[in-house]
Swiss-Prot record:
<feature type="short sequence motif" description="'KMSKS' region">
    <location>
        <begin position="266"/>
        <end position="270"/>
    </location>
</feature>
<dbReference type="InterPro" id="IPR032678">
    <property type="entry name" value="tRNA-synt_1_cat_dom"/>
</dbReference>
<comment type="subunit">
    <text>Monomer.</text>
</comment>
<keyword id="KW-0030">Aminoacyl-tRNA synthetase</keyword>
<dbReference type="Pfam" id="PF01406">
    <property type="entry name" value="tRNA-synt_1e"/>
</dbReference>
<keyword id="KW-0547">Nucleotide-binding</keyword>
<dbReference type="GO" id="GO:0008270">
    <property type="term" value="F:zinc ion binding"/>
</dbReference>
<feature type="binding site">
    <location>
        <position position="29"/>
    </location>
    <ligand>
        <name>Zn(2+)</name>
    </ligand>
</feature>
<feature type="binding site">
    <location>
        <position position="234"/>
    </location>
    <ligand>
        <name>Zn(2+)</name>
    </ligand>
</feature>
<dbReference type="GO" id="GO:0005737">
    <property type="term" value="C:cytoplasm"/>
</dbReference>
<dbReference type="GO" id="GO:0005524">
    <property type="term" value="F:ATP binding"/>
</dbReference>
<feature type="short sequence motif" description="'HIGH' region">
    <location>
        <begin position="31"/>
        <end position="41"/>
    </location>
</feature>
<comment type="similarity">
    <text>Belongs to the class-I aminoacyl-tRNA synthetase family.</text>
</comment>
<keyword id="KW-0479">Metal-binding</keyword>
<dbReference type="InterPro" id="IPR015273">
    <property type="entry name" value="Cys-tRNA-synt_Ia_DALR"/>
</dbReference>
<feature type="modified residue" description="Phosphoserine">
    <location>
        <position position="270"/>
    </location>
</feature>
<dbReference type="InterPro" id="IPR015803">
    <property type="entry name" value="Cys-tRNA-ligase"/>
</dbReference>
């Protein structure tokens, strides 16, 4: 079964054939680290971490690069407002980013390059563009000469005449054409800066990714990915810079994930309708948030609400409960062989259907449907009077494998009997104090861990589900 990817560049699904057999070069645009990320910012890391995991499952060696923009107008503004320097703020929010996305099940990239650690190659890249006639200096700034690049607009599918019609030169800009964009910005008084052939300054946003992608992955990469808001102008400008310099295709497959909406309106810091990952993972299990995000195809928008999150949690718990029941039945199962082939054949069908979904442009929504199907089928098998260890192990292994591909975990560490008794005692005390909210919370927490409570006249009994 071959993998097909929807390529933004061609607006169609294409068979995925990497440049090098069994190797994938993948670049995902990372955050500007001036604040905590919101759940809209967290969607690309989760989506493309899942893409990476599936490619690795299929046997590819994935070189996964995701950058940090650690110098930028937003960082400079934050530094001025807080009375701190830019590196201090950047370091703080790089660490916060790692805490958030690690909680959400994302693996670290092969490389996480930072702009400030790659200034030499960025300046060199700009100088080469100037030498080739694709860029020009203007009073300390350097701009890309868009009209010199014939393919401009091909990613966003916009004719250059239409783009130019809607563009304008802002006050203070020193460019020749409204579509020209900054590669290097002259430093203003009091701003952080680096020395360059054009004077003191810092790079523009777009050039950073082109330079770092080239350094770590080469002139041509297999997959370039990010949120759909980056397609224009950021990714369009990356293509122009990179292909003008090398004369080669910059990226062969372009992937873009959809927005997250709050009440049908795009979530963004500028609108103030955002939910920080830093906050929501204190309220909800990060694994639930990831499962919720993957329940929708990555190119589709997600309308976020706590009601939908709770509904998704119910489904996730059904799968986890089935898994827990399978694990507990393992002990009492036998080496029975009757009818094994029938059940094992059905299990294999679920595996095939899961892979077919993922091969179809990483359709995690359909893949998760197969997780529900596995759980439902396993529950039917558990109704059998006698169960086979071989079949039970096949269900368990399949659920573990599929969850791992999606970056999800199936179970928390099992509670010891003494820990359960302690929690029951706390619940009894809470009920005596008429703290029914705490009592219910303890009961629900135990239920999530597959511990069922039964209140009787003789006291509270418990059993593993």
């Amino acid at each position: 079964m071959t993998i097909h990817i929807y390529n933004t560049l061609t607006r169609q699904k294409e068979e995925f054939v990497p440049l090098e057999e069994n190797k994938v070069k993948m670049y995902v645009c990372g955050p500007t680290v001036y604040n905590y990320i919101h759940i809209g910012n967290a969607r690309p890391p989760m989506v493309f971490d899942t893409v990476r995991r599936y490619l690795e499952y299929k046997g590819y060696d994935v070189q996964y690069v995701s950058n940090f923009t650690d110098v930028d107008d937003k960082l400079i503004k934050a530094a001025n407002e807080l009375g701190e320097d830019v590196p201090t703020i950047a370091d703080r929010f790089v660490e916060a980013y790692f805490e958030d996305v690690t909680a959400l099940g994302c693996k670290h990239a092969t490389v996480h390059p930072r702009v400030t650690e790659n200034m030499d190659i960025i300046i060199e890249f700009i100088q080469e563009l100037v030498n080739k006639g694709y860029a020009y200096e203007s009073e300390g700034d350097v701009y890309f000469k868009t009209k010199e690049f014939e393919g401009y607009g091909k990613l966003s599918h916009q004719p250059i005449a239409d783009l130019r019609h809607g563009a304008r030169i802002e006050v203070g800009e020193k460019k020749q054409d409204p579509l020209d964009f900054a590669l290097w910005k002259a430093a203003k008084e009091g701003e952080i800066f680096w020395e360059s052939p054009w004077g003191q300054g810092r790079p523009g946003w777009h050039i950073e990714c082109s330079a770092m992608a080239r350094k770590y992955l080469g002139d041509t990469i297999d997959i370039h990915a990010g949120g759909q808001d980056l397609a224009f102008p950021h990714h369009e400008n990356e293509i122009a810079q990179s292909e003008a310099l090398t004369g080669k295709t910059f990226a062969r497959y372009w992937m873009h994930n959809g927005y997250i909406n709050i009440n049908n309106e795009k979530m963004s810091k500028s609108l103030g309708n955002f939910i920080l990952v830093h906050d929501i993972i204190k309220q909800y299990d990060p694994q639930l948030i990831r499962f919720f995000m993957l329940s929708v195809h990555y190119r589709h928008p997600i309308n976020f609400s706590e009601e939908l999150l709770q509904s998704t949690n119910n489904g996730l718990e059904r799968i986890k409960t089935a898994y827990g029941n399978l694990k507990h039945r393992m002990e009492s199962s036998t080496d029975l062989t009757d009818h094994n082939e029938k059940w094992l054949a059905e299990i294999e069908k679920f595996q095939t259907a899961f892979e077919e979904a993922m091969n179809d442009d990483f359709n995690t929504a359909n893949a998760i449907t197969e997780l529900y199907n596995v759980a439902n089928h396993a529950n039917q098998y558990l109704l059998e009077e006698h169960t086979s260890k071989v079949v039970i192990e096949a269900y368990v292994k399949q659920l573990e494998t599929l969850f791992d591909i999606l970056g999800l975990e199936l179970s928390k560490e099992e509670l010891l009997d003494e820990e359960i008794e302690e929690l029951i005692q706390k619940r009894i005390e809470a009920r005596k104090n008429r703290d029914f909210a705490l009592s219910d919370q303890i009961r629900d927490d135990l239920k999530e861990r597959n511990i069922i409570l039964e209140d009787t006249a003789q006291g509270t009994r418990w059993k593993r589900g």
